[in-house]
């Protein structure tokens, strides 16, 4: 009987690490609902479900109050396999002083923000060594915190809810050395997540600038080269039935339903896992922001423009290192 080689075993662990995170929301949600329905309908153990719901109500605001991270979870060896699968690489252009707080603004979102999760919700890329004295708080959809056990898993990585109250708390109640991480394009940017794309949803998104001004914290641009190369999408005929449905659905729930595909459990198979393609994230220079309690729209627009200029500069300085043409520019929509 032939045993798998060390290389084959490592490859299998890399694939499993990506699979378990990519589908954890679906698996945990399905399991929690099924088990609790069974307890309530078919057993006398319905009080267990009541206790779970009571805890959920009691703990409801924790994701908006700094979350509940577990350092040991962030250091799981599983995340190293997750990072090696692509692989992921995190680079900085400037040192970050831990005597201040920051808002790190990430681009592009991609379909599942794999790079951002690996870099900032785990220690697989060596965040604490690259940015000593800085505590990262990656912000994500509030829906991830609605389901018992899933919310615990997500919060254990240091993730918090992406809401105004959450950002206010992190920037005012946690001392200094905190980095609030927002992937500003959100799910609306998924429709532009195509290999080679450099299109960002940013033109009308200035709330993060207003928050930075109100707290007087620097904005840091970050760009993940390769994030949009992790999946392919089928593009439906513009104006056709499916395309109209996609746009209608996005207008209703702010999520663009994509017909995406990647690889399967083996390298050359078809499936819904991301392709094993490198993602390198460049963290730029902090952009200083004055503290203005109630900034006018003109002031917000001014610093929004300055931020976009800094992001373009970061992109242009590094794009050719990652196979992007010298003539290709960021498209801000």
Curated annotation (Swiss-Prot):
Q: Which reaction does it catalyse?
A: a long chain fatty alcohol + a fatty acyl-CoA = a wax ester + CoA; all-trans-retinol + an acyl-CoA = an all-trans-retinyl ester + CoA; an acyl-CoA + a 1,2-diacyl-sn-glycerol = a triacyl-sn-glycerol + CoA; 11-cis-retinol + a fatty acyl-CoA = 11-cis-retinyl ester + CoA
Q: Does the keyword NADP apply?
A: no
Could you tell me which Pfam families the record lists for this protein?
Answer: DAGAT
Q: E.C. number, please?
A: 2.3.1.75, 2.3.1.76, 2.3.1.20
Principal cellular location given in the protein's record? endoplasmic reticulum
Bilayer topology term: Multi-pass membrane protein
**Which CDD domains did the record assign?**
LPLAT_MGAT-like (cd07987)
Activity regulation: the record says: 11-cis retinoids act as allosteric modulators of acyl-CoA retinol O-fatty-acyltransferase (ARAT) activity by suppressing esterification of 9-cis, 13-cis, or all-trans retinols concurrently increasing the enzyme specificity toward 11-cis isomer.
Signal peptide range: none
**Which Gene Ontology MF annotations are present?**
2-acylglycerol O-acyltransferase activity; diacylglycerol O-acyltransferase activity; long-chain-alcohol O-fatty-acyltransferase activity; retinol O-fatty-acyltransferase activity
Where on the tree of life does the source sit, at the highest rank?
Answer: Eukaryota
Biological process (GO) annotations held by this record are: acylglycerol acyl-chain remodeling; lipid metabolic process; monoacylglycerol biosynthetic process; retinoid metabolic process; wax biosynthetic process
Q: Where found?
A: Endoplasmic reticulum membrane
User: Can you tell me where the transmembrane regions are?
Assistant: 15-35, 38-58, 130-150
Report if keyword Metal-binding is assigned: no
The UniProt keyword set, sorted, is:
Acyltransferase, Endoplasmic reticulum, Lipid biosynthesis, Lipid metabolism, Membrane, Transferase, Transmembrane, Transmembrane helix
Q: In which tissues is it expressed?
A: Highly expressed in skin, where it is primarily restricted to undifferentiated peripheral sebocytes. Also expressed at lower level in other tissues except pancreas.
Q: Name one GO cellular component term.
A: endoplasmic reticulum membrane
Quaternary structure, from the entry: Monomer.
Describe the function of this protein: Acyltransferase that catalyzes the formation of ester bonds between fatty alcohols and fatty acyl-CoAs to form wax monoesters. Shows a preference for medium chain acyl-CoAs from C12 to C16 in length and fatty alcohols shorter than C20, as the acyl donors and acceptors, respectively. Also possesses acyl-CoA retinol acyltransferase (ARAT) activity that preferentially esterifies 11-cis-retinol, a chromophore precursor of bleached opsin pigments in cone cells. Shows higher catalytic efficiency toward 11-cis-retinol versus 9-cis-retinol, 13-cis-retinol, and all-trans-retinol substrates.
Q: Provide the family line.
A: Belongs to the diacylglycerol acyltransferase family.
Protein name per Swiss-Prot or TrEMBL: Acyl-CoA wax alcohol acyltransferase 2
């Amino acid at each position: 009987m032939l045993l798998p080689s060390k290389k084959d075993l490592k490859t299998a662990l890399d694939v499993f690490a990506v699979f378990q995170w990519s589908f954890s929301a679906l698996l945990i949600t399905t399991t929690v609902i099924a088990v609790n329905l069974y307890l309530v309908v078919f057993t006398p153990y319905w009080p267990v479900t009541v206790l779970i719901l009571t805890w959920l109500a009691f703990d409801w605001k924790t994701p908006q109050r700094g979350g509940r991270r577990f350092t040991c979870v962030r250091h799981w060896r599983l995340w190293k396999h997750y990072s090696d699968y692509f692989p992921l690489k995190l680079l900085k252009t400037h040192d970050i002083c831990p005597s201040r707080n920051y808002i790190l603004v990430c681009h592009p979102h991609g379909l599942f923000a794999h790079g951002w999760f690996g870099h900032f919700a785990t220690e697989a890329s060596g965040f604490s060594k690259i940015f000593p004295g800085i505590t990262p708080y990656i912000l994500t959809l509030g829906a991830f915190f609605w389901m018992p056990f899933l919310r615990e898993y997500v919060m254990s990585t240091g993730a918090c809810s992406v809401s105004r109250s959450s950002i206010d708390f992190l920037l005012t109640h946690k001392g200094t050395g905190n980095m609030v991480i927002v992937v500003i394009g959100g799910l609306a940017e998924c429709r532009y997540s195509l290999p080679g794309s450099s299109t960002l949803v940013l033109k009308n998104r200035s709330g993060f600038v207003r928050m930075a001004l109100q707290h007087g914290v620097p904005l840091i641009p970050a760009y993940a080269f390769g994030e949009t190369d992790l999946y392919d999408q089928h593009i439906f005929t513009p104006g056709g039935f499916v395309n109209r449905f996609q746009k209608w659905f996005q207008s209703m729930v702010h999520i663009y339903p994509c017909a995406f595909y990647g690889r399967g459990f083996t390298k050359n198979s078809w499936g819904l896992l991301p392709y094993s393609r490198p993602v390198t994230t460049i963290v730029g220079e902090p952009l200083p922001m004055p503290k203005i309690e109630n900034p006018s729209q003109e002031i917000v627009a001014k610093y929004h423009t300055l931020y976009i200029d800094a992001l373009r500069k970061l992109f242009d300085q590094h794009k050719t290192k990652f196979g992007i043409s010298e003539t290709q520019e960021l498209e801000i929509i």
